[in-house]
């Protein structure tokens, strides 16, 4: 099969499995008309699953990927009793701060590569559009972007796995990431840290383990409520990074919000906890 689009950076086609015309065997894949091709298999497939189709895609960096669609009976996940819970407050600079005071310390893969990307973009601007040199430079930039995406996904998978292993209930805010990404002040940070992707990973990992992700209302004033006395502080500017209350409470603004998010999530779930567990 041939890809039809010349402009779309991600080109793909999908084919259905009919009469066994798609076969996966010993790190080799048989596709209609393409025959047998060698692949790097991401993970092993359970023999009970039924192969339904395949989607072959060519990314902007010229690498080919195939996604296989399988059908299987959805397993019943045993709901585990909640013994441990944590609240996560979204942070522009660190991905999140949790209710135990721990910071994710997100590596900022895109920002670290910005200088190199800008240099390669300048070189591209000096090439004649459509020339072989132009296409070669364009692919080089695409490879850089693909590398950043892989770094980000790897980090977010590991971070979400760590949390899913330790906690039975995870509480977060329902944020409109699309709206935030369009803000000139936050756009780059929102795209860089991948909070939406992180929460998606966290959601399915928790579900598979019989655990739960609770999203609290985005209008809940988690940053303005004192986590010690419960008093609402009406005047709180975005640049105020330390939360100070008349009761004497003084702590990191995001940590204070994370504690409130955790408590609100527990309230919504109807769960009471006497113990806490921290990630070691």
Language-model-detected regions and their locations in the chain:
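Nucleic-acid substrate recognition interfaces
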Residues: 1-280
């Amino acid at each position: 099969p041939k890809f039809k689009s010349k402009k779309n950076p991600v080109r793909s086609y999908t084919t259905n499995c009919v009469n066994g015309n798609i076969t996966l065997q010993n790190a080799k894949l048989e596709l209609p008309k393409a025959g047998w091709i060698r692949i790097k298999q991401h993970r092993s497939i359970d023999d009970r699953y039924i192969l339904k189709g395949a989607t072959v895609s060519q990314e902007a960096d010229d690498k080919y990927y195939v996604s296989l669609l399988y059908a299987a009976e959805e397993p019943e996940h045993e709901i585990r009793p909640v013994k441990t819970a944590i609240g996560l407050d979204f942070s522009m600079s660190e991905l999140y701060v949790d209710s135990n005071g721990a910071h994710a310390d997100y590596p900022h893969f895109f920002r670290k590569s910005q200088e190199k990307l800008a240099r390669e973009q300048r070189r591209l601007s000096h090439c004649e559009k459509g020339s072989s040199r132009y296409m070669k430079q364009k692919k080089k930039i695409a490879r850089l972007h693909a590398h950043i995406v892989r770094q980000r996904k790897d980090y977010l998978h590991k971070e979400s796995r760590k949390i899913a292993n330790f906690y039975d209930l995870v509480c977060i805010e329902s944020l409109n990431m699309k709206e935030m990404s369009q803000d000139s002040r936050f756009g780059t940070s929102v795209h860089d840290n991948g909070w939406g992707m992180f929460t998606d990973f966290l959601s399915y990992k928790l579900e598979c383990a019989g655990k739960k992700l609770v999203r609290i209302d985005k209008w809940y004033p988690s940053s303005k409520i004192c986590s010690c006395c419960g008093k609402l502080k009406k005047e709180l500017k975005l640049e105020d990074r330390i939360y100070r209350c008349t009761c004497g409470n003084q702590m990191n603004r995001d940590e204070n919000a994370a504690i409130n998010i955790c408590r609100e999530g527990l309230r919504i779930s109807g769960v009471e906890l006497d113990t806490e567990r921290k990630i070691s």
